[in-house]
């Protein structure tokens, strides 16, 4: 899609869309009218597409037929082009042109002269009788010769000019196909066809022989004739000059298919008219093969498509062992059947032998590589190569070298080299003698010459550099190397120098050296920008920043040095913490960063190692040795001490340093630095000075990887080398410093972990090691009192008490959390490194905040805007990767914001107020605003959420509410000089810098936040996801962190390590159900959505930040352990009075036996005899299957690349997953790309469930459903009448068959009992108190394997509706009853795929189907949702007609109209797990099809659910236009010659399964480890295609044949033989299975039960003894009649459809007992 089209697609205004559509319609209406002038003929779609390639528009309204319309249209277009070149006011002579075509030239008939003569017999009919040898008389300067030049000789053309002195310029159209020079078929078969004979070839426009033109092969010389002169003029144009001109020049102006426009003019002798170098006619896809056999006629003679050759070569090389038979089969597979006629069988045999020959050659390179050679070996490489070439020329090439020469094909170009030709006559029409060798020789020589220069450049490269893999050395060796290169380069030609320059630019970074100058102290983000264009950087490019300048380090990467009074006394460089990387064992490594690349002056890398250079420095001059390498000391550098100090350590801590410069990609495996020279337990400092790399650590419990960038450093703690190993990989060229010490530098782990991390600007209060100063000492209880719950506490120090008093705290005694003392205040030790802002430089509205900060013992510091963070946020906004409001703004405005974010360089005053929730961070600000109303108009308050904005408005009612805004609205509104960013940790990363960049009037930014709470989360696709949070960015400006709260009492605050003001109150409760009134906090968005739908006030743990609530309910479920500490702290710090915990996550008990696990199952099926289960544990024996002989041969296919196309086209997980509004689905499973192609729909996927509910479920009240039923009675009657007519339903109403009903009930129960135990353990649905109309909805778990859904965008899943079990058994009984009734009247021409085997369907297709006419198939849009009231009326009408009792129908209608779910009452629709789901879908499908179309008895049709296929595309009923509006069901008809039905393809040879479908399903089963479970069923599906033998070539295309072969191979490898599909149905019928297992068993069958007796029964002839009571002589038939009458007379109105009514309906209504007798 073009950019303009994308802009139009973004139009959303309906009026604009309508205007755009109208403009498109007008343009489409005008263009065909213009096209009719050139293209008045109707063309087929392939012809129209071909013409459009030539820039010719056709009209869809053209109706005039023509035998060769496309060719004629091209002819007209050529004349139109010529008309643009002709002079408008001068007369032109038109030769061989019909008068009816004068309009194509854009000229008037009276203006020009027509000179037509007979050149061939058909010209007599065109132009009248003229002398065939006459020459046209031309009295004008310009002339046009139409479609005749190809019949003329150069002498005739010369004669035309010589007889007409006034003729200067001639436009001629030439019709000759360029492919005829190579005897190739037509390049444009839709326009013309070609046939080749001995001396001639035929050009057939449109493939119509009646309009064919026959040419001799000699006429093709016109395609390379650029100049025509007199006889022998090429030898001497002076001895035999022309009368008027020296020669004629011919220029090719245009080519369209075989039509060419030639421009011929006189050329004077004094004019130097050079020949063009080449004429190009068409792009070529044809090639010839090199000669590999002797004699030459044994080689491939013909020309073949390049794609065909390459595909065959790759096929032969990719198959493990290819045979000649495989090659022939592959050729048959890749060549279309209609194309076979143009190939010579003899040449195909030669072609197959060519492929077989090259496949047997060695495909592994036998050339040597200098990569592993030493310096001497590399210098001798060129000598060895020359010797090898010399001996190969004498003794013959190696197999690999020969293979390289014969695999490259010889291109056949559709070009000509223009020539000078003599004006000959009859000789012109003789066939030229083409020479392949002369045509290809110049190209071969050029190729050989080019390869020679390339090899020379390669050898010189090796000699000059000495080592290909050697990194950049110091500058001392560069002049010598350069001089040598210049001396050798002087011997090369110009072309050699050019080639060598190109090679060295790409291969050797030293020739010429690729240098990139970087300004000192460049920030990291600037360095990254400059290195994007050169990803493979040398170390000189990225490590030119000197540590000698650390004394002048600015704040925040500024280019201006700070003042003297702001510099650190210990030269401590400003650093940031990039992250903490925990190991599996609990060890943590903190990575800090200078934010830029660094370099120590004076480092000289002299030691060469594999993949790196090194230098070693030590204070005592001692060297360093380890396995394989040894380093001598180069002394010590002053810059090394500065680097140690910059990392926060004392210089005396380390006395040795190893400097290493890594090449890109070099690595060091896992090892430990346990040399004896170093004491055990010593610390090691590693500085990644420049470049990128990964540092892996491994212990016994797992591995962790650290990503290192420019300026990163970290320390391996004491004892690390004894417990861990580490490795290094250089992602880019990398420079590193490793500091060690030979004396003990480790310290024992302190018992007082209060030391502040030197590199954290403001530490986490939860980490007691981040305290500044010694506030208290953690003491452990005595050994004798280990059970004591409160630790020893020390008084709070004076600075802490003072800070607490300033914030209104009176609880000044120490508190604890049960294990250790809580610190109320955490001071920032490094705050003195920040530069303070000057109050006098600020505007008057900002100055009161300086006094406020001073009163709180806080400072206001200067912050330089971070352009990298600002640009990342604004770029994400512009690209619609973050936010909902801002991306919709004007694109120009967003672009200007991005530009400001990139370029704004200014400092802003920052006041950072950090504290716990309820610490009073914003209280002082609000009091200041209340006391100074004039300040309210000079500030803006920016908040992350609407809830927080409402909180500010409530606390400042006198303030203009427009001054309080969310962060996205803040970007749109005007700015003020002071901006308060409340709870700024929840703002997107980079927003603060971006806002300050685009709002240039902001002088003071006040930041309030809590670094212990959760921060803003962003998707991974955005740039800001890689940035550190705002808290981490600005915490360095916070003087202290106030870890105390006024909000919560000690009972709630101390457990989360917060000092509390309130000593009393607070409660922690536990409940089993969620309370009604309190706010509910849940861990996941999906739970929040569900509770909100139920009317609860719910928020997520992280989303409640900023709120204060009295009472709070926190739900604990399976997602709670996944939440971070920050998120849990946020949730626990919200409540001020009580927290109620509700545990909703319960463990599932182990499954029990069937009856014990489901207590209601016994009462439900107590009357089903248990002896039906006898023998169920006896496995059925597999039938003996004989081998089926192979009837055809399919070429071996490569199994590794079959799914590559879909894998490459597949989008990433985040793009494919569906967004439910709260979270994404989880349909893409595992890391296997093949498995990822298949969506895995799972019942536990809450996001998918929500999307599926929205897509599949419709809601309506019972009243609305009843109203719809009344309004659609006529529609239901129409459906039934059409159904009855087509399905031959008896006209009389059928009586109720009690015996059939009982039999169907037995079938339903047996099927139910045959299910797995897990399916039966649905105790709730068997509960008698479970409402009859209640439905449980859940997702269907499945792997989606449909062809159109594999690798495609994900869609909603399928729902399963779980009814009460007795309801299901009753409706299933009804469905089975109706099925049996339907089978009694179903016509033979209708096949319903229900309880039918594929063999039966195959027989139906083979014996009845008509493939000689177009077939019809149809799909539906939302079929289940469209089974509404009209179809329910049809079902009830049909069931009533077939004798189903009214009480059953009333109950069925009730559950359809009163279906209750957790969402509410459902509309009338089809639900899965209904009893009659499949049967009702099928019947409704038949009825709809019969109502819409006229279906006669001659139509064969197959139906199954919503699938249908017919062998005839029937006429639509005339009344359908009036009936269509009655139905919401919409069909998508398709008339095709390749019908599909239920996954089967219907063919003349029978039904077959799609091999692509089978292959994909097998691949999924293989990767899931389930192949043994599915291989037999897949083999049965595969069998139908396997049995066809050679006929599969008529059914499958090339891709399907490959998949068929791979399926065959997979099944054979898994031990499968061709199975028998069998004639039995795979239904759950225990009785039939027993008969298979024990053929001696006796079957006793009645209408009430089917039983199997393993032993011969003992029969008593007269069981009832003679007595005094009279015997009942009533006939059984009359008893049955009485029972049925009693059942049918049961009033439907008496049914309440609740309680045990369904139980009575199912158990007693037709058992011969009254429902009321119990």
From Swiss-Prot:
| Pfam families noted in UniProt | 2OG-FeII_Oxy_2, RdRP_2, Viral_helicase1, Vmethyltransf
Q: Which reaction does it catalyse?
A: RNA(n) + a ribonucleoside 5'-triphosphate = RNA(n+1) + diphosphate; ATP + H2O = ADP + phosphate + H(+)
Q: Where is the (+)RNA virus helicase ATP-binding domain?
A: 889-1042
Domain (+)RNA virus helicase C-terminal intervals: 1043-1176
**For the region Disordered, what residue ranges are annotated?**
467-513, 548-578, 746-796
> What InterPro entries does the record tag this protein with?
(+)RNA_virus_helicase_core_dom (IPR027351), AlkB-like (IPR027450), AlkB-like_sf (IPR037151), Alphavirus-like_MT_dom (IPR002588), DNA/RNA_pol_sf (IPR043502), Oxoglu/Fe-dep_dioxygenase_dom (IPR005123), P-loop_NTPase (IPR027417), RNA-dep_RNA_pol_alsuvir (IPR001788)
Q: Which CDD domains match?
A: Alphaflexiviridae_RdRp (cd23246)
Specify the Fe2OG dioxygenase domain's residue ranges.
Answer: 653-743
Instruction: Specify the RdRp catalytic domain's residue ranges.
Output: 1413-1520
Q: Where is the composition biased (Polar residues)?
A: 467-496, 556-568, 756-773
- Gene3D superfamilies linked: Alpha-ketoglutarate-dependent dioxygenase AlkB-like, P-loop containing nucleotide triphosphate hydrolases
In this chain, ATP is annotated as bound at: 915-922
According to its UniProt entry, the protein's GO biological process terms are:
DNA-templated transcription; mRNA modification; RNA processing; viral RNA genome replication
Domain named Alphavirus-like MT: residues = 59-223
The regions listed as transmembrane in this protein's record are none
Q: Name one GO molecular function term.
A: RNA helicase activity
User: Which key words are in the record?
Assistant: ATP-binding, Helicase, Hydrolase, Multifunctional enzyme, Nucleotide-binding, Nucleotidyltransferase, RNA-directed RNA polymerase, Transferase, Viral RNA replication
Q: What is its EC number?
A: 2.7.7.48, 3.6.4.13
The family assignment reads: Belongs to the potexvirus/carlavirus RNA replication protein family.
- Please describe what this protein does: RNA replication. The central part of this protein possibly functions as an ATP-binding helicase.
Q: What name appears for this protein in its UniProt entry? A: RNA replication protein
């Amino acid at each position: 899609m073009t950019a303009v089209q994308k802009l139009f697609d973004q139009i959303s205004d309906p009026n604009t869309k309508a205007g755009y559509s109208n403009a498109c319609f007008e343009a489409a209406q005008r263009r065909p009218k213009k096209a009719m002038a050139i293209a008045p003929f109707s063309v087929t779609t392939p012809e129209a597409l071909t013409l459009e390639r030539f820039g010719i528009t056709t009209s869809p309204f053209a109706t005039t037929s023509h035998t060769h319309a496309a060719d004629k249209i091209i002819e007209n277009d050529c004349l139109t082009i010529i008309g643009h070149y002709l002079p408008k006011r001068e007369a032109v002579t038109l030769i061989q042109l019909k008068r009816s075509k004068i309009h194509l030239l854009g000229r008037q008939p009276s203006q020009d002269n027509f000179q037509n003569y007979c050149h061939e017999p058909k010209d007599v009919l065109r132009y009248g009788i003229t002398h065939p040898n006459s020459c046209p008389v031309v009295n004008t300067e310009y002339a046009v010769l139409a479609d005749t030049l190809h019949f003329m000789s150069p002498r005739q053309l010369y004669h035309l000019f010589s007889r007409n002195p006034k003729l200067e310029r001639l436009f001629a159209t030439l019709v000759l196909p360029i492919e005829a020079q190579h005897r190739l078929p037509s390049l444009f078969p839709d326009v013309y066809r070609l046939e080749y004979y001995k001396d001639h070839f035929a050009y057939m426009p449109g493939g119509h022989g009646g309009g064919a033109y026959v040419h001799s092969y000699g006429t093709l010389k016109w395609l390379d004739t650029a100049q025509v002169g007199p006889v022998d003029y090429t030898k001497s144009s002076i001895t035999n000059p022309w009368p008027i001109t020296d020669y004629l020049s011919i220029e090719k102006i245009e080519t369209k298919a075989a039509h060419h426009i030639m421009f011929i003019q006189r050329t004077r002798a004094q004019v130097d008219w050079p020949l063009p170098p080449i004429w190009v006619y068409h792009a070529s896809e044809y090639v010839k093969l090199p000669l590999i056999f002797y004699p030459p006629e044994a080689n491939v003679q013909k020309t073949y498509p390049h794609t065909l050759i390459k595909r065959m070569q790759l096929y032969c090389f990719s198959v493990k062992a290819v045979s000649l038979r495989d090659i022939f089969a592959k050729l048959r597979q890749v060549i279309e059947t209609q194309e076979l006629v143009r190939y010579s069988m003899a040449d195909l045999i030669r072609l197959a032998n060519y492929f077989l020959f090259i496949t047997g050659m060695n495909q592994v390179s036998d050339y040597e590589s200098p990569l592993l050679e030493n310096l001497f070996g590399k210098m001798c490489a060129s000598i060895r190569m020359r010797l090898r070439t010399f001996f190969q020329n004498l003794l013959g090439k190696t197999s690999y070298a020969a293979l390289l020469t014969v695999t490259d094909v010889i291109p056949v170009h559709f070009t000509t080299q223009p020539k000078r030709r003599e004006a000959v006559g009859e000789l012109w029409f003789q066939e030229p003698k083409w020479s392949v060798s002369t045509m290809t020789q110049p190209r071969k020589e050029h190729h050989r010459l080019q390869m020679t220069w390339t090899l020379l450049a390669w050898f010189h490269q090796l000699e000059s550099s000495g080592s290909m893999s050697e990194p950049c050395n110091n500058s001392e060796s560069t002049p010598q190397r350069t001089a040598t290169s210049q001396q050798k380069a002087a011997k090369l030609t110009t072309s050699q120098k050019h080639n060598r320059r190109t090679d060295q630019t790409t291969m050797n970074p030293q020739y010429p050296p690729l240098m990139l100058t970087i300004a000192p102290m460049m920030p990291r983000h600037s360095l990254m920008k400059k290195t994007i264009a050169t990803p493979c950087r040398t170390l000189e490019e990225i490590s030119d920043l000197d540590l000698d300048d650390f004394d002048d380090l600015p704040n925040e990467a500024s280019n201006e040095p700070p003042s003297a009074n702001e510099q650190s006394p210990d030269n401590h460089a400003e650093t940031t913490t990039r992250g903490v990387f925990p190991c599996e064992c609990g060890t943590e490594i903190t990575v800090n960063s200078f934010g830029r690349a660094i370099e120590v002056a004076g480092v000289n890398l002299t030691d060469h190692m594999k993949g790196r250079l090194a230098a070693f420095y030590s204070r005592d001059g001692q060297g360093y040795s380890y396995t394989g390498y040894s380093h001598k000391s180069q002394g010590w550098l002053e810059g090394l001490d500065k680097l140690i100090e910059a990392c926060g350590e004392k210089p005396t801590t380390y006395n040795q340093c190893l400097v290493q410069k890594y090449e890109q990609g070099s690595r060091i495996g896992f090892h430990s630095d346990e040399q004896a020279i170093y004491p055990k337990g010593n610390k090691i400092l590693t500085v990644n000075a420049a470049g990128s790399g990964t540092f892996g650590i491994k212990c016994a419990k797992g591995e962790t990887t650290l990503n290192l960038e420019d300026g990163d450093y970290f320390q391996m703690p004491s004892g690390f080398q004894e417990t861990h190993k580490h490795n290094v990989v250089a992602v880019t060229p990398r420079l590193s410093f490793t500091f060690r010490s030979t004396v003990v530098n480790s310290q024992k782990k302190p018992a007082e972990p209060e030391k502040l991390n030197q590199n954290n600007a403001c530490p986490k209060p939860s980490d007691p090691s981040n305290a500044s100063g010694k506030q208290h000492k953690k003491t452990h209880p005595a050994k004798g009192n280990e059970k004591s719950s409160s630790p020893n506490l020390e008084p709070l120090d004076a600075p802490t008490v003072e800070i607490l008093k300033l914030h209104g705290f009176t609880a000044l005694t120490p508190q604890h959390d049960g294990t250790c003392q809580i610190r109320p205040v955490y001071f920032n030790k490094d705050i003195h490194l920040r530069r303070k802002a000057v109050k006098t430089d600020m505007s008057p509205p900002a100055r009161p905040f300086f006094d406020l900060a001073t009163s709180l013992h806080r400072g206001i510091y200067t912050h330089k805007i971070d352009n990298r963070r600002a640009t990342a946020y604004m770029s994400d906004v512009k690209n619609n990767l973050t936010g909902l409001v801002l991306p919709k703004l004007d694109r120009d405005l967003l672009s200007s914001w991005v530009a400001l974010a990139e370029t704004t360089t200014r400092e802003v005053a920052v006041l950072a107020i950090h504290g716990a929730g309820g610490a009073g961070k914003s209280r002082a600000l609000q009091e200041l605003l209340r006391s100074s109303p004039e300040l309210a108009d000079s500030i803006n308050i920016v908040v992350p959420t609407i809830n927080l904005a409402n909180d500010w408005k409530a606390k400042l009612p006198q303030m203009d509410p427009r001054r309080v805004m969310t962060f996205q609205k803040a970007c749109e509104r005007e700015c003020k000089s002071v901006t308060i960013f409340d709870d700024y940790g929840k703002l997107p990363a980079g927003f603060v810098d971006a806002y300050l960049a685009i709002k240039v009037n902001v002088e003071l930014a006040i930041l309030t936040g809590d670094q212990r709470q959760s921060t803003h989360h962003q998707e991974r696709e955005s740039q800001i996801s890689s940035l550190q949070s705002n808290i981490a960015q600005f915490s360095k400006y916070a003087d202290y962190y106030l870890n105390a709260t006024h909000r919560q009492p000690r009972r709630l605050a101390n457990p989360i390590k917060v000092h509390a003001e309130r000593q009393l109150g607070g409660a922690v409760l536990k409940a089993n159900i969620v309370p009604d009134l309190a706010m509910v906090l849940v861990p996941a968005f999906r739970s929040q959505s569900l509770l909100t739908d139920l009317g609860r006030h719910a928020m997520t743990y992280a989303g409640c930040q900023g709120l204060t609530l009295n009472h709070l309910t926190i739900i604990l479920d399976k997602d709670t352990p996944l939440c971070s500490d920050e998120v849990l702290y946020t949730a626990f710090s919200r409540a001020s009075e009580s927290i109620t915990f509700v545990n909703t996550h319960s463990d599932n008990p182990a499954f029990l036996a069937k009856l014990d696990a489901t207590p209601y199952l016994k009462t439900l099926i107590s009357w089903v005899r248990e002896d039906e289960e006898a023998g169920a544990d006896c496995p059925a024996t597999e039938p003996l299957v004989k081998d089926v002989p192979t009837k055809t041969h399919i070429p071996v296919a490569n199994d590794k690349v079959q799914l590559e196309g879909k894998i490459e086209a597949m989008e990433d997980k985040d793009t494919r997953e569906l967004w439910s509004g709260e979270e994404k689905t989880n349909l893409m499973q595992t890391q296997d790309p093949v498995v990822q192609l298949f969506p895995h729909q799972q019942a536990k996927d809450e996001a998918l469930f929500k999307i599926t509910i929205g897509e599949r479920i419709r809601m309506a009240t019972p009243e609305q459903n009843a109203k719809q039923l009344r309004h659609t009675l006529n529609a239901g009657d129409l459906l039934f009448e059409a159904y009855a007519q087509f399905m031959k339903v008896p006209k009389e109403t059928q009586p109720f068959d009690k015996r059939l009903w009982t039999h169907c009930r037995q079938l339903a129960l047996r099927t139910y009992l045959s299910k797995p135990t897990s399916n039966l353990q649905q105790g709730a649905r068997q509960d008698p108190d479970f409402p009859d109309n209640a439905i449980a909805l859940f997702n269907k778990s499945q792997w989606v394997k449909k062809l159109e859904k594999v690798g495609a965008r994900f869609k909603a899943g399928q729902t399963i509706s779980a009814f009460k079990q007795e309801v299901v058994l009753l409706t299933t009984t009804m469905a089975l009853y109706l099925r049996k009734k339907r089978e009694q009247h179903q016509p033979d021409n209708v096949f319903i795929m229900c309880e039918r085997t594929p063999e039966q369907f195959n027989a139906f297709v083979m014996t009845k189907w008509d493939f000689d006419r177009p077939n019809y198939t149809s799909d539906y849009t939302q079929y289940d949702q469209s089974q509404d009231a009209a179809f329910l009326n049809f079902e009830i009408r049909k069931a009533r007609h077939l004798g189903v009792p009214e009480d059953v129908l009333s109950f069925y209608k009730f559950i359809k109209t009163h279906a209750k779910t957790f969402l509410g009452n459902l509309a009338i629709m089809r639900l899965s797990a209904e009893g009659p789901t499949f049967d009702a879908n099928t019947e409704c499908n038949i009825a709809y099809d019969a109502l819409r179309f006229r279906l006669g008895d001659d139509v064969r049709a197959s139906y199954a659910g919503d699938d249908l296929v017919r062998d005839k595309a029937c006429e639509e009923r005339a009344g359908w236009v009036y009936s269509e509006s009655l139905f919401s069901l919409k069909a998508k008809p398709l008339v095709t010659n390749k019908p599909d039905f239920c996954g089967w393809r219907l063919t003349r040879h029978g039904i077959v399964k799609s091999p692509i479908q089978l292959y994909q399903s097998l691949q999924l089963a293989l990767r899931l480890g389930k192949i043994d479970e599915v291989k037999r069923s897949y083999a049965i599906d595969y069998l139908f295609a396997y049995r066809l033998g050679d006929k599969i070539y008529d059914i499958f295309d090339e891709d399907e044949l490959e998949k068929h072969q791979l399926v065959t191979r997979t099944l054979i490898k898994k031990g499968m033989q061709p199975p028998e599909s069998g004639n039995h149905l795979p239904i759950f019928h225990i009785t039939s299975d027993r008969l298979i297992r024990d053929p001696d068993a006796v079957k006793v069958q009645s209408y009430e039960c089917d039983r199997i007796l393993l032993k011969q029964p003992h029969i008593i002839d007269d069981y009832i003894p003679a007595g005094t009571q009279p015997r009942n002589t009533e006939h059984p038939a009359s008893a049955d009649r009485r029972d049925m009458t009693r059942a049918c007379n049961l009033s439907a109105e008496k049914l309440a459809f609740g309680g045990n009514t369904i139980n009575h309906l199912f158990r007693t209504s037709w058992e011969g007992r009254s429902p009321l007798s119990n």
